[in-house]
């Protein structure tokens, strides 16, 4: 938290003072992801109940090999290797390796207007495929945490660099 407090002080100095959060407190806390696991679990379980989450047993080397030939941007498009495993296959694989958990993404184009970059359209299924929501060690992925946090904290405007613009439609 020491570094978070220093960052908050720097932002205050620049005139970018937050209304609430971190050391300031407020009604939408807790403000540190490490303290929000129960909140993420609640929303993760909603996706599980809807049948949108599945276990993935692929190692990084398997994912990298399955995506050959590799894209010039370095991104790996998940091929859906574990998406349709039978319950029996899941039990067998779980005995050998603890799974990470992915969310199923639809194969459709999503369009929005970015305040800086202008009109943007992307098909997440083709751009990255089903993505991780939870690592094998139980830690929730950024992609879940940021969506839940933005929604619950009333975030309406987000400034991002060009590299994560493809995550915008997740929020």
Predicted regions and their residues:
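Active-site cores that bind ATP or allylic diphosphates and position pyrophosphate for catalysis
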Residues: 61-170
């Amino acid at each position: 938290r020491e570094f978070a407090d220093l960052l908050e002080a720097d932002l205050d100095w620049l005139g970018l003072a937050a209304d609430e959060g971190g050391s300031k407190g407020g009604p939408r806390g807790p403000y540190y992801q490490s303290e929000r696991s129960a909140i993420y679990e609640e929303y993760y379980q909603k996706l599980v109940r809807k049948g949108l989450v599945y276990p993935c047993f692929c190692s990084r080397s398997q994912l990298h090999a399955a995506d050959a030939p590799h894209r010039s941007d370095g991104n790996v498009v998940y091929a859906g290797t574990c998406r349709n495993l039978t319950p029996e296959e899941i039990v067998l694989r779980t005995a050998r390796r603890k799974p990470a958990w992915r969310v199923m993404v639809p194969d459709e184009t999503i369009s929005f207007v970015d305040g800086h970059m202008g009109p943007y359209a992307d098909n997440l299924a083709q751009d990255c495929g089903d993505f991780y929501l939870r690592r094998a060690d139980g830690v929730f992925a950024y992609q879940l945490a940021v969506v839940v946090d933005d929604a619950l904290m009333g975030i309406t405007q987000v400034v991002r660099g060009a590299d994560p613009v493809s995550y915008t439609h997740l929020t």
